[in-house]
Design a protein with these regions (language model features):
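Transmembrane alpha-helices and adjacent helix-loop boundaries
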Residues: 1-340
Length: 340
């Protein structure tokens, strides 16, 4: 019984996402869900993929990357271009989407590997600067390529997949992303990755190939960022490089930090909340006030950092820590049983 409970607990995120997918699929097939709702579901799925993939680097590897939007940009433009090229022969079919996802993800992973080889020898602020620069370079290069290739400053016009089923594909890819990341992190390789985060020098002394593991994590993270970009291109009529600036990388980072570093479930929850918040802010902050949206995320990030590091808040953090609250509740229940 305990083993079954632990199995359910360890796979709770799969169960919840699968249940959500089945519920909204039935709602969609019966015509009880509108297009605005499916658009929101698509955005949530993309945000979860981006947050959990960046969480591998920031939360489990312990390295700060600010170029996640750059890898997403690669996937978005390649996915859109491949879809445009295949549309005359395959149409807007699952085959077209499948090919676009594979190619977009693999090319983003290759760029992640190329950038990772020299960059991952750096640490902390230096790595953050390099990845931030990479994201801006990708965005600028794509924007200045000939219009016939990726649309130039006007952006790349993309074909639209069947809107009724895109959110289903998106959540299937979410499950694939979670399965890949969680299986890796629960294996011996995941323990090696965590040891690098905790103490890189000690990990090296134990014979762990630090560079190899860093490169593997960075490459997998880039792969799923590319997939997120491909999905994004299918939700837009035109992909523009301005959508992938450093502000978007910061927004993804806020999801990871808000959910808790090293917590996949936390990243899922935070990505969902931030996406809903985005939709609300876009309706509330219009015109000149739209710039305040990025300021809002900066304030959230600052408050989280202060909360996690301020010595004066340590008693409060320990008192209301979720693990401590659960442990205290279990202790109270055990005490009650002993009294009875």
């Amino acid at each position: 019984m305990i083993a079954f409970y632990n199995k359910i607990k360890n796979n709770l995120n799969y169960i919840i996402i699968a249940a959500v997918l089945i519920f909204f699929t039935v709602m969609s097939l019966t015509g009880n869900i509108g297009r605005s709702d499916t658009v929101l579901l698509e955005k949530v799925a993309i945000a979860i993929i981006l947050a959990t993939s960046l969480g591998m680097v920031v939360g489990f590897l312990g390295e700060l990357s600010l170029g996640h939007a750059g890898f997403m940009c690669i996937g978005a433009y390649l996915g859109g271009k491949i879809s445009s090229l295949l549309e005359p022969t395959l149409g807007n079919s699952f085959a077209t989407l499948f090919i676009a996802v594979i190619v977009g993800g693999l090319v983003a992973a290759i760029f992640g590997m190329i950038i990772g080889l020299p960059a991952l020898r750096l640490r902390g602020d230096y790595l953050a600067i390099v990845t931030l620069a990479f994201g801006e370079i990708v965005r600028t290069v794509v924007m200045n390529l000939p219009e016939g290739l990726f649309g130039g400053t006007l952006g790349l016009k993309t074909p639209r997949f069947n809107n009724k089923y895109l959110f289903i594909v998106a959540f299937v890819l979410v499950l694939l992303c979670l399965a890949t990341i969680q299986n890796l992190l629960r294996s011996k390789h995941g323990r090696a990755i965590s040891s690098i985060r905790d103490n890189e020098i000690a990990a090296r002394s134990m014979g762990i190939d630090v560079t190899k593991y860093k490169l593997v994590v960075f490459t997998i993270s880039s792969f799923f960022a590319g997939i997120g970009g491909v999905l994004y291109s299918y939700t837009q009529s035109r992909v523009q490089s301005a959508s992938f600036d450093y502000n978007y990388s910061i927004e993804i980072l806020v999801m990871v930090v808000l959910g808790g570093l090293g917590s996949i479930n936390g990243s899922i929850i935070a990505a969902t909340l931030i996406t809903f918040l985005n939709v609300k802010l876009q309706t509330l902050l219009t015109g000149d006030l739209a710039v305040l949206q990025n300021l809002f995320y900066a304030v959230i990030l600052i408050l989280i950092v202060i909360y996690n590091n301020a010595p004066a808040l340590k008693p409060f953090r320990e008192k209301y820590n979720l693990k401590n609250l659960v442990a205290a509740k279990k202790k109270d229940n055990n005490d009650e049983k002993e009294v009875k």
